[in-house]
Each structure stands twice: as structure tokens, then as C-alpha cells.
Amino acid sequence: MKRHAVWSSLFVVILAVLIDQGIKYLVESRMFYGQQIDLLPFLALFRTHNEGIAFSMLAWLHDGGLIAITLAVIAFVLYLWWTNAPERVFARYGFALVIGGAIGNLIDRVMHGYVVDYVLFHLPTWSFAVFNLADAFITIGAGLIILEEFLGWRRERISH
């Protein structure tokens, strides 16, 4: 992989981790557990903890199992990132966001035994699961990877 691709991806990973951990620090230090601060009619900060992974799944694995799974996922995504062609920019930054988000949540799990969640989308009769910025980075990263795959498929289809 080209040097520029490595450094720019590393920058995205570090920035994602720093932003995620900075916000989580503010939430943990300035909000009590279960506190909700409404920002917009449909958006609030709501401090909670997730002892599993997405949507509290696999909480029964406890810290050791969840840390092992997270490390395996990070290693796999690093492999995909490293073997990705540098000109596949959406995928490169997508992998970087997935890695940054996974590291952000891994830091929480190692330090606290849970992941700090705080973003709540809600309506008067409905609410979405509470999540954090690391989760959003992972989701956006996955979306960029899928976009890159779609664009590659489309380019290949047009060229034939």
C-alpha cells in the first residue's frame, strides 16, 4: 500500500478514536447514569452502558470473550484494509472508520467493562437503540465499503 494511503488512513483511525473517547469522557464525567438531555425534539444525550456488542448482543460472553471478538474483528479488518488497492478510496477510509470505531469501543470495554452509549433518537411513541459515535463510525465505514464494492461492480459491468 502506498505511504500516503497508510498515513491518511492512520489519521482517520486516530481522529475517530480521539473524538469518540473525548465525547465519552464528557458524558461519563458530566452526566449521571440514565440522565437524558434533550438536544432536539427527536435527539437526546442519554447516558447508558452496553455490556454486550450491538444492541447488547452476546453480553453473556462477558469482557474476555467480547475483547477477543473485537480484537479478531480489528485484525480481520486490518487485513482487508492492507490488501485493499490504494485507489479504492471509499473502501480505504471505510476500513479506517471501522477500525477507529472498534478501537474506541474496545478501549471502553477494557477500561470500564462496558461500552459507553449516549446518542438517542426518539419520537413520542418510539425510540431507537442508544448508541455512540464509535458505533456510527463503524456503520458509516461499512457503508463506504459497500459503496466502493457497488462502484467497482458497476465499473466492471460497464467495461464489459
UniProtKB/Swiss-Prot annotation:
One of its GO terms (molecular function) is aspartic-type endopeptidase activity. The keyword Iron-sulfur does not apply. One of its GO terms (cellular component) is plasma membrane. It is a multi-pass membrane protein. It holds the Pfam family Peptidase_A8. It is found in: Cell inner membrane. Its EC number is 3.4.23.36. InterPro entries: Peptidase_A8. It catalyses: Release of signal peptides from bacterial membrane prolipoproteins. Hydrolyzes -Xaa-Yaa-Zaa-|-(S,diacylglyceryl)Cys-, in which Xaa is hydrophobic (preferably Leu), and Yaa (Ala or Ser) and Zaa (Gly or Ala) have small, neutral side chains. It is an enzyme of class 3 (hydrolase). The chain crosses the membrane at residues 6-26, 58-78, 95-115, 127-147. The active site is at D117, D135. Its main location: membrane. Keywords: Aspartyl protease, Cell inner membrane, Cell membrane, Hydrolase, Membrane, Protease, Transmembrane, Transmembrane helix. Signal peptide: none annotated. Belongs to the peptidase A8 family. PANTHER family: LIPOPROTEIN SIGNAL PEPTIDASE. This is Lipoprotein signal peptidase. It comes from Brucella canis (strain ATCC 23365 / NCTC 10854 / RM-666). The gene is lspA.
